[in-house]
């Protein structure tokens, strides 16, 4: 694994639509960090690695069927042009679900090379030949991998050193503790007949922490049984040590 260049996370995005970047990554926390050089983003136009007069990047699927498939030779040349040992990721709905654990691991590394699929998908041979890690951001279909790449990078960049103003904020958010977040409130004290829970204005920080944990556990148990089961299993494991 290469070390971070100048201590910066380096993202290379391979796409047919480089004009989509930085997009939302150019504003707010990610945009400020990009402008300050806390991370690096570059794009690679996949079509630049196509050959022939028409510079075709796709072809009809072997065996028939609808749509087109991105060509292995073209994609491989694009990947090889930036291969320096960083993880190679393919954004695809058939990939492993993106988790906060994987996001944090990426943030701790030197960066990532991200391939944005289009059409029906990418020739399986280049996925195998270049050992691409297939990642999904959810069980739904997008027009291409660019939006998914932006989601992944936004999640990663906010964890980089110096990006978030309050480190504790990142450590107490949903998924970092294995739970969904507790409810949040701020002034005014009462709004449309709904008051901020008294415990949050009591000044008793121990009681506040306990209330927040109980609320996070309740919300996780009700909304994400899968996360709740994993959380309980982890607690039993820790308790048994």
UniProtKB/Swiss-Prot annotation:
One of its GO terms (molecular function) is tRNA (guanine(37)-N1)-methyltransferase activity. Its main location: cytoplasm. It holds the Pfam family tRNA_m1G_MT. The keyword Transport does not apply. Its EC number is 2.1.1.228. The keyword Methyltransferase applies. It catalyses: guanosine(37) in tRNA + S-adenosyl-L-methionine = N(1)-methylguanosine(37) in tRNA + S-adenosyl-L-homocysteine + H(+). GO terms for biological process: tRNA N1-guanine methylation. One of its GO terms (cellular component) is cytosol. It is found in: Cytoplasm. SUPFAM superfamilies: alpha/beta knot. Keywords: Cytoplasm, Methyltransferase, S-adenosyl-L-methionine, Transferase, tRNA processing. S-adenosyl-L-methionine binds at residues 117, 137-142. Belongs to the RNA methyltransferase TrmD family. Specifically methylates guanosine-37 in various tRNAs. Homodimer. PANTHER family: TRNA (GUANINE-N(1)-)-METHYLTRANSFERASE. This is tRNA (guanine-N(1)-)-methyltransferase. The lineage of its organism: Bacteria, Pseudomonadati, Pseudomonadota, Alphaproteobacteria, Hyphomicrobiales.
